[in-house]
């Protein structure tokens, strides 16, 4: 007897999902070996391959389902039956949350992001793990107090085995205990506590992270140990117990962690305890499930929309030449729409802009480039769009809009975490805030450059300040690889009148960049000029940029830490 079509389609989608996630975990599992062997190029390549997996498998699955269904579009009755059959299979799937997202992606790909109905796909989750699922199988739990902490830490570090030995385990134990005793929560001095660590190690860039929490008298504090490698041995670089720093470690501007998580939802539930203010979608993104993070973001957005009454408005700041940006004032996300025509002198195409955003998605963002999600045919309630915003969108991006009686549908947009534009921040900052922001700004450019990214347009308006005070780049239409740039010094004028000429007295090729010119548009205010020349004067020297290029070409991978240098034990010991 032939299997019903809806059953065959549902089983095929689930099988293809499991094939995708099996390969996802296989790539992830190689992280330990890459860390132990200091295979930093392999780290980058594996990260890119893993990001590309999802779309590849969704595309292949879509083609197969279309073949199974035939040339005619399926009826609404059949679509409901397919979802029903898939829902019947979910109890057997341990990673059902991400499986729902995979089903959604296949459905949307088939229907080109139209016919989005709750009865056809998983706008709301079908299953739940409940409020308090048992996480004990994921954890190692150590009960101790400050007096017995050295013995506990010795056991703890020994439980995480690597082919490389610890450089000096006793030194690391002393550093951890000292830092907790001097700077940790005061309650640790008076009460016994438990350290709960996830058994699986989190890998990113050159680091391996033991991630967990301290539980004491009903209170919870993060407990994160970043491990680094010398090539011959490993060492503990610091201990993180501050919720704010834990949030930065899992920040939206960093590369995705590699952690072996067959059931990522359980990891998210655990991590939520140490980052209670970070939404689930950002945690899913951080552990590499960014496509399910997109599903969670959409659900989060729908929930916020239902609980608020305000209107979407044009985002504060200088209007972009390429993007129109808007937001809901109470929501921590901005929406970015590519304009139909770009404001001169911008000379890029729509496809080039999209390619830049794809580049950022697959590149190591080193904590300095905001992650984005890409949406097609995104719907907004028309009565929630302010008149000014609607007029703006009709003016700059009419081809992207579809209006119905009660909806505004935008054909293509990006979402991004909301930040304060750096230029607006500096307008209101006092002297200390200005200095810290400019220090962050220069560090952001240097770290991006060391990661082979040249921002292109370095105006302050293209950078944002996060709630933690970090400066992050978010305007990608002019980025390029450092290795594509030709950094030059401006040649001396041939004659005195050359300096007054409207045209340069030297030839300029498309990829020529003159760092001396950065000062013209960045250092107009005396206070900004003084601070930048104190902290980052090398940014205006072509030789500095050439040195960075040389490092990149020689395969030098810079160290980038998700915490300040003074937090490192090596710095505290005077190393």
From Swiss-Prot:
Active site per database record: 371
Cysteine pairings via disulfide bonds: none
Gene Ontology terms: cellular component: cytoplasm
Similarity comment text for this entry: Belongs to the AceK family.
Domain of life: Bacteria
Subcellular location: Cytoplasm
Name of the gene this protein is made from: aceK
Gene Ontology BP annotations: glucose metabolic process; glyoxylate cycle; tricarboxylic acid cycle
Name assigned to this protein: Isocitrate dehydrogenase kinase/phosphatase
EC number: 2.7.11.5, 3.1.3.-
Binding sites annotated in the UniProt record for ATP: 315-321, 336
Main subcellular localisation: cytoplasm
Physiological role: Bifunctional enzyme which can phosphorylate or dephosphorylate isocitrate dehydrogenase (IDH) on a specific serine residue. This is a regulatory mechanism which enables bacteria to bypass the Krebs cycle via the glyoxylate shunt in response to the source of carbon. When bacteria are grown on glucose, IDH is fully active and unphosphorylated, but when grown on acetate or ethanol, the activity of IDH declines drastically concomitant with its phosphorylation.
Reactions this protein catalyses: L-seryl-[isocitrate dehydrogenase] + ATP = O-phospho-L-seryl-[isocitrate dehydrogenase] + ADP + H(+)
């Amino acid at each position: 007897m032939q299997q019903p079509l809806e059953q065959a389609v549902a089983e095929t989608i689930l099988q293809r999902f499991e094939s995708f996630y099996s390969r996802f975990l296989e790539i992830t599992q190689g992280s330990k070996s890459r860390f132990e062997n200091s295979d930093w190029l392999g780290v980058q390549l594996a990260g890119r391959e893993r990001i590309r997996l999802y779309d590849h498998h969704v595309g292949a699955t879509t083609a197969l389902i279309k073949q199974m269904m035939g040339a005619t579009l399926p009826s609404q009755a059949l679509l409901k039956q397919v979802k029903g059959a898939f829902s019947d299979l979910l109890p057997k799937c341990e990673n059902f949350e991400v499986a729902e997202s995979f089903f959604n992606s296949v459905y949307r790909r088939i229907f080109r992001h139209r016919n989005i109905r709750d009865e056809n796909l998983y706008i709301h989750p079908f299953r739940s793990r409940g409020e308090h699922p048992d996480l004990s199988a994921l954890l190692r739990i150590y009960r101790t107090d400050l007096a017995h902490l050295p013995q506990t830490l010795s056991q703890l570090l020994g439980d995480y085995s690597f082919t490389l030995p610890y450089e000096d385990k006793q030194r690391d134990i002393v550093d951890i205990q000292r830092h907790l005793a001097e700077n940790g929560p005061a309650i640790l001095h008076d009460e016994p506590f438990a350290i709960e660590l996830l058994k699986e190690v989190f890998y990113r860039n050159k680091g391996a992270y033991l991630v967990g929490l301290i539980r004491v008298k009903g209170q919870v504090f993060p407990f994160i140990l970043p491990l680094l490698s010398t090539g011959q041995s490993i060492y503990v670089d610091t201990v993180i117990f501050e919720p704010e720093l834990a949030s930065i470690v899992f920040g939206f501007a960093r590369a995705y962690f590699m952690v072996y998580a067959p059931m990522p939802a359980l990891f998210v539930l655990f991590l939520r305890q140490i980052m209670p203010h970070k939404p689930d979608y950002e945690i899913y993104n951080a552990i590499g499930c960014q496509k399910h993070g997109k599903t969670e973001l959409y659900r989060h957005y729908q929930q916020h929309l239902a609980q608020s009454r305000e209107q979407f408005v044009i985002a504060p700041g200088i209007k972009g030449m390429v993007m129109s940006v808007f937001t809901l004032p109470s929501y921590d996300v901005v929406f970015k729409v590519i304009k139909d025509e770009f404001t001169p002198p911008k000379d890029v195409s729509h496809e080039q802009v999209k390619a830049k955003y794809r580049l950022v998605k697959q590149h190591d963002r080193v904590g300095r480039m905001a992650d984005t999600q890409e949406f097609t045919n995104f719907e907004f309630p028309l009565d929630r769009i302010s008149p000014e915003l609607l007029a703006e969108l009709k003016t700059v991006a009419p081809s992207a809009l579809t209006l119905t009686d009660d909806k505004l549908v935008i054909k293509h947009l990006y979402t991004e975490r909301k930040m304060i534009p750096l230029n607006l921040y500096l307008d209101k900052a006092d002297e200390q805030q200005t200095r810290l922001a400019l220090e962050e700004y220069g560090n952001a450019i240097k770290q991006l450059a060391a990661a082979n990214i040249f921002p292109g347009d370095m105006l302050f308006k293209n950078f944002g300040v996060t709630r933690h005070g970090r400066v992050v780049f978010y305007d990608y239409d002019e980025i390029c690889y450092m290795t594509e740039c030709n950094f030059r010094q401006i040649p001396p004028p041939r004659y005195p009148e050359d300096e007054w000429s409207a045209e340069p007295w030297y030839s300029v090729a498309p990829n020529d960049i003159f760092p001396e010119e950065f000062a013209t548009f960045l250092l107009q205010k005396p206070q900004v000029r003084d601070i930048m020349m104190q902290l980052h004067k090398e940014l205006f020297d072509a030789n500095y940029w050439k040195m960075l290029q040389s490092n990149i070409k020689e395969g030098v991978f810079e160290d980038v830490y998700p915490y300040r240098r003074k937090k490192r034990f090596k710095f505290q010991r005077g190393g």
